[in-house]
């Protein structure tokens, strides 16, 4: 793809008219929001009319005021309003979240406290710590509607969306985009605030339309953000985990399932792992990123939440004979990430379920992928891996994890990663274009002719083309375990690309691997709380760490109880709040209130309704679930025996054009004796190499390549290569007992663990306070899990 593509830079940050701190003042007739930039070099004024209770009237002063000019202006405002009620300071804030209207007055949502959570290429990233909602019309002109029970209930409902948890923004970096899109996108004037990951897009729609800019608002992403500084062999680097939750078809577990008519899926989350090397000031920053996604199975399927049935039946709706919605979904993935779409489907097999639940979706999913692939050329076909993680996990967490790492290695060979060297401050793009400013953004010709701009160019060496998409039934517990495996393998690749050497990252005793596991567990808990109503189950990670015990088992049991309670009793209010926040439901006087509608009427589009067309779907009392589609079925045995050596580019070698392929079949491996922990000398004697995941056949051990980026041949791991053990492993069949679902996968019977503890015979009335004895017995019954 050419050698070292160049990126035309954005304007230097110091020249951007970015407002970062604001003070709100009020008179009886207007609000005045005064904003300044970070360097306090200029001030701007936004006037908000308080005399109209039905319309939003905003006026932007084009003048850029100095500090002294603003002080004089405020003095005049105080004097001029002495007799009419004064010029009062209301609050300090850090940006407008948006404007919302329920039945009558408009409200303004402000960030009143922020917290710094990290930096990306010199751009500060913040989380919301506190927010405030302020009614715009003066109380003297508000009608009775503004104080009606329905209005107050809508206000309370909106507060269910807790803006102080997991909402993030940046003034100078498009946090809704991956690093590759930020640095590689040179288009101007894109509607950035309308992208799928901007959760306040609806709330800011009117102010952006009126002012034709976005300097007063911030674009919020919802999900997860964590940044950690590390050091390996004296070399310092920073790794960042970002999870971006899509606002399309967003909601709670049983009320948002599957796919909608236009291809949007439930629980759609993009996870980006960024690793950047710490370099002296003034040098370009070597930085890499890998993106993976999760999302509900993109079919029309549903489960009806029930107080009496914690594991409701899965109902598959076959109304879409040509799988058009599913095709829309994967076409969208190609547009976003490139042609190489790899699907890791963790649903259970027929032998893995005593009662067919997930099996129904697994079979239809495979059928769908085959249908889609019929009309596509080889390059564009979906590539699917069917892997019953529940079944393989029963043979040992290490073995299951080893499988997942193999899949991740193959996926990385297909998609590659993004790597560049970027100056601090790159990627801001034209954050704002405001014709009122004295220093308009220069043209590209002007930028190219400026010597100073040369230092703002990013050197791009590798591009990610495609994405790994993972799903289980809920895209929570098992999916997070699999995404950690991909993150761990990717981290080794990223460190190798950055030229950072050290002990093997995939060695789970490596502190770096443990640090990354902590981050993915925390992300998993956060995403599970958002979608499922409880933290994620911890059994898989605990088994991987070797610290699964009775205390952790009981904790997972109560996690299942909390998830069940939230799904049965709280999800309806949460879904209503999300629908109002995102603009999927817009209250109107004279029409039914949201809480008066049937539980799933948010999803349909009726004539004259006040619902958003993007959430339309046929009327059905259940929720539709979305997961991932596959191309064909991967035979694990073929995968681990395959002799394919990837090519790696040097740091200045350009982007590879390697065309890697692997087969897909609907079979399961016969042996799962993977990842046995061995002493180093035993490992070397058994395999002739310290490498995990060798790429060649077991018949040629001496010629195996170093095909795991991030690991040199001198490294000695504590894990036996999966291929070697697979070749000499036993051929006995895998038991299908003790399988578990997403919700309860970590709450298996103690008879299948190394623990000798057993739960006592259920009796008494205080087993689970607040729940019936029958339900308590169900919770503690091994058969239920």
UniProtKB/Swiss-Prot annotation:
PROSITE patterns: SAC. Its EC number is 3.1.3.-. Ubiquitous with a higher level of expression in young seedlings than in other tissues. Component of the PI(3,5)P2 regulatory complex at least composed of ATG18, SAC/FIG4, FAB1 and VAC14. Residues 158-533 form the SAC domain. A motif (Phosphatase catalytic core) lies at residues 469-480. This is Phosphoinositide phosphatase SAC5. It is an enzyme of class 3 (hydrolase). The phosphatase catalytic core motif (or RXNCXDCLDRTN motif) from the SAC domain is found in metal-independent protein phosphatases and inositol polyphosphate phosphatases. Residues 688-707 are annotated as: Disordered. Residues 688-700 have a biased composition (Polar residues). The PI(3,5)P2 regulatory complex regulates both the synthesis and turnover of phosphatidylinositol 3,5-bisphosphate (PtdIns(3,5)P2). PANTHER family: PHOSPHOINOSITIDE PHOSPHATASE SAC5, POLYPHOSPHOINOSITIDE PHOSPHATASE. GO terms for cellular component: vacuolar membrane. It catalyses: a 1,2-diacyl-sn-glycero-3-phospho-(1D-myo-inositol-3,5-bisphosphate) + H2O = a 1,2-diacyl-sn-glycero-3-phospho-(1D-myo-inositol-3-phosphate) + phosphate. GO terms for biological process: phosphatidylinositol dephosphorylation. It is a peripheral membrane protein. Its cofactor is Mg(2+). It is found in: Vacuole membrane. GO terms for molecular function: phosphatidylinositol-3,5-bisphosphate 5-phosphatase activity. Keywords: Hydrolase, Membrane, Vacuole.
């Amino acid at each position: 793809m050419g050698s070292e593509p160049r990126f035309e830079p954005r304007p230097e940050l110091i020249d951007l008219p970015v407002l970062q701190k604001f003070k709100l003042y009020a008179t009886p007739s207007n609000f005045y929001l005064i904003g300044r930039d970070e360097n306090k070099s200029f001030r701007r004024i936004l006037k908000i009319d308080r005399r109209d209770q039905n319309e939003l009237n905003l006026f932007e002063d084009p003048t850029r005021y100095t500090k002294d000019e603003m002080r004089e202006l405020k003095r005049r405002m105080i004097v001029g309003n002495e007799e009419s009620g004064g010029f009062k300071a209301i609050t300090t804030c850090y940006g407008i979240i948006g404007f919302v209207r329920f039945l009558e007055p408009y409200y303004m949502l402000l960030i009143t406290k922020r917290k710094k959570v990290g930096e990306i290429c010199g751009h500060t990233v913040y989380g919301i710590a506190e927010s405030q909602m302020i009614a715009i019309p003066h109380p003297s002109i508000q009608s009775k509607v503004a104080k009606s029970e329905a209005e107050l209930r809508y206000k309370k409902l909106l507060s269910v969306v807790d803006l102080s948890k997991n909402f993030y923004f940046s003034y100078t970096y498009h946090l809704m985009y991956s690093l590759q899109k930020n640095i590689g996108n040179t288009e101007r004037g894109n509607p950035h605030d309308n992208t799928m990951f901007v959760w306040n897009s609806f709330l800011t729609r009117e102010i952006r339309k009126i002012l034709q800019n976005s300097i007063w608002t911030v674009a919020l992403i919802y999900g997860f953000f964590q940044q950690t500084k590390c050091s390996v062999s004296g070399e310092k680097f920073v790794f960042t985990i970002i999870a971006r939750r899509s606002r399309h078809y967003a909601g709670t577990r049983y009320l948002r399932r599957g796919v909608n008519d236009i291809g949007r899926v439930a629980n759609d989350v993009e996870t980006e792992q960024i690793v950047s090397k710490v370099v002296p000031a003034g040098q370009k920053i070597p930085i890499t990123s890998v993106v993976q996604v999760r999302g509900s199975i993109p079919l029309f399927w549903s489960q009806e939440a029930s107080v009496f049935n914690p594991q409701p039946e899965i109902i598959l709706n076959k109304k879409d004979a040509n799988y058009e919605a599913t095709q829309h979904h994967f076409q969208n993935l190609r547009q976003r990430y490139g042609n190489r779409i790899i699907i890791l489907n963790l649903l259970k097999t027929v032998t893995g379920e005593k009662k067919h639940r997930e099996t129904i979706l697994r079979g239809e999913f495979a059928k769908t992928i085959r249908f889609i692939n019929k009309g596509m050329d080889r390059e564009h076909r979906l590539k699917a891996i069917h892997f019953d993680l529940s079944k393989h996990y029963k043979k040992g967490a290490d073995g299951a994890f080893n499988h997942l790492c193999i899949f991740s290695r193959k996926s990385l060979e297909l998609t590659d990663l993004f790597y560049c060297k970027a100056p601090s401050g790159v990627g801001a793009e034209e954050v704002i274009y405001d014709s009122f400013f004295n220093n308009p953004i220069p043209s590209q010709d002007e930028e190219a002719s400026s010597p100073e701009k040369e230092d703002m160019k990013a050197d791009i060496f590798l591009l990610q083309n495609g994405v790994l998409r993972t799903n289980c039934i809920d895209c929570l517990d098992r999916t997070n375990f699999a995404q950690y495996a991909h993150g761990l393998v990717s981290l080794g690749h990223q460190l190798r690309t950055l030229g950072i050497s050290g002990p093997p990252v995939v060695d789970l005793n490596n502190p770096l691997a443990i640090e990354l596991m902590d981050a993915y567990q925390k992300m998993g808990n956060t995403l599970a709380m958002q979608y499922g109503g409880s933290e994620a189950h911890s059994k898989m990670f605990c088994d991987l760490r070797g610290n699964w015990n009775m205390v952790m088992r009981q904790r997972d049991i109560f996690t299942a109880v909390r998830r069940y309670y939230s799904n049965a009793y709280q999800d309806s209010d949460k879904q209503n709040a999300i629908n109002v926040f995102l603009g999927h439901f817009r209250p109107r006087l004279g029409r039914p209130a949201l809480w008066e509608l049937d539980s799933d009427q948010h999803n349909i589009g009726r004539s004259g309704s006040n619902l958003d067309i993007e959430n339309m779907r046929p009327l059905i009392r259940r929720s539709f679930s979305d997961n991932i589609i596959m191309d064909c079925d991967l035979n694990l045995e073929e995968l681990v025996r395959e002799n394919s050596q990837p090519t790696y580019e040097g740091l200045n070698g350009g982007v590879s054009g390697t065309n890697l392929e692997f087969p897909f079949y609907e079979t399961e491996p016969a042996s799962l004796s993977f990842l046995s922990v061995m002493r180093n000398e035993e490992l070397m004697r058994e395999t002739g190499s310290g490498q995990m995941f060798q790429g060649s056949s077991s018949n040629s051990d001496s010629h195996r390549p170093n095909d795991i980026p991030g690991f040199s041949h001198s490294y000695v791991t504590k894990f036996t290569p999966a291929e070697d053990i697979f070749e000499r492993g036993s051929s006995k069949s895998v038991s299908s007992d003790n399988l578990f679902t997403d919700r309860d996968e970590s709450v298996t019977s103690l008879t299948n663990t190394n623990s000798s503890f057993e739960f006592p015979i259920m009796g008494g009335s205080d087993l689970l306070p607040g729940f019936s004895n029958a339900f308590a017995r169900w919770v503690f019954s091994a058969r239920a899990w």
